Regions:
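Walker A (P-loop) phosphate-binding loop of ABC-type ATPase nucleotide-binding domains
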Residues: 38-42
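Catalytic Walker B motif of ABC-type/P-loop ATPase nucleotide-binding domains
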Residues: 157-160
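Conserved ABC transporter NBD signature motif
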Residues: 59-70, 74-75
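Conserved ABC ATPase "signature" region
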Residues: 99, 103, 110-128
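ABC transporter nucleotide-binding domain
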Residues: 176-269
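Helix-to-loop junction immediately C-terminal to a conserved catalytic motif
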Residues: 51
């Protein structure tokens, strides 16, 4: 089941700048989805739209089976977003930061304390309880920021370049934390990143975007195949027709087929023979 479906979304600002140019993508529930792209590709704009800070100019977004624009208020309680700038208060203790988050969302105190203890242990934050938050390293502050956003028990967690500026050890610890959130808590993670290695190591699905539009989307293995193999791209009149064509071709061909909006990508070393066989 899809957690997020983005269809032909356009975002044009009042100054005429078009940040998104008809982007389409699909995020499945319970996966780590990485959005990979350079500065200016449109990642931040899409993230702001998905977290209800901006409205798209056109297109449609479905999140958790609800229309994002129409049901934004009800969806806000089911998602959490960790920005590049941490939102923790360095004048509060670790526990105070986490319990403050729970009070903002009106979580009962007993439930909040139980949730807090689980997150502190599971995310390896217990050794830091005795130290002031102001003394934490950047990596530990980022992990605490994610933990306090998990206090609300979100169904989707948005992470905006969570490992930027981290050393190797901190980055590896963060990767482990993200896997645990997906595997043990069942939370869908939508991750933006500059790092190809990070997307490859963590993701169930990677979407590469450029100039406000997706270039391709698939598993890391599919994207590696795209780089090393010949491919055929078939464009249909609609996404529905593309899905129908995908089903027919999968019955006739043994090659890997990737569905991307109204297009199909067929990966093959011998494209001509596969076309004749179909």
């Amino acid at each position: 089941m899809s957690a997020i479906q983005v269809k032909q979304v356009v975002k044009q600002y009042k100054n005429g700048v078009q940040a998104l140019n008809g982007i389409s993508l699909c995020v499945e529930q319970g996966e780590i989805f990485s959005l990979l792209g350079q500065n200016g590709a449109g990642k931040s704009t899409l993230l702001r739209i998905l977290t209800t800070y901006l409205q798209p100019t056109s297109g449609r977004i479905t999140m958790l089976e609800k229309d994002l624009c129409r049901d934004a208020a009800s969806l806000r309680s089911q998602i959490a977003c960790v920005a590049q700038q941490t939102s923790i208060d360095t004048y509060l203790s670790l526990e105070e930061n986490m319990l403050l988050q729970s009070r903002l969302y009106r979580i009962p105190k007993r439930d909040a304390e139980k949730r807090m203890e689980t997150l502190i242990v599971d995310f390896g934050l217990e050794p830091y309880r005795r130290y002031p938050v102001s003394s934490y390293s950047g990596g530990v502050k980022r992990r605490l920021d994610i933990a306090l956003n998990m206090m609300t028990n979100p169904k989707i967690l948005f992470l905006d370049e969570p490992t930027v500026g981290m050393d190797v050890q901190s980055r590896i610890a963060m990767w482990g934390m993200m896997r645990k959130i997906r595997d043990d808590f069942g939370v869908t993670i939508f991750l933006t990143t500059h790092y190809l290695e990070e997307a490859d190591q963590l993701s169930n699905t990677v979407c590469i975007m450029k100039d406000g539009k997706e270039v391709t989307q698939g598993s890391p293995a599919q994207l590696r195949s795209l780089l090393r193999q010949n491919s055929i791209e078939i464009t249909f009149s609609s996404e529905a027709e593309a899905r129908k064509g995908c089903g027919i071709l999968k019955e006739q061909m043994s090659k890997e087929i990737l569905l991307r909006a109204e297009k199909l990508l067929i990966y093959t070393q011998t494209p001509q023979s596969d076309i004749e066989a179909a």
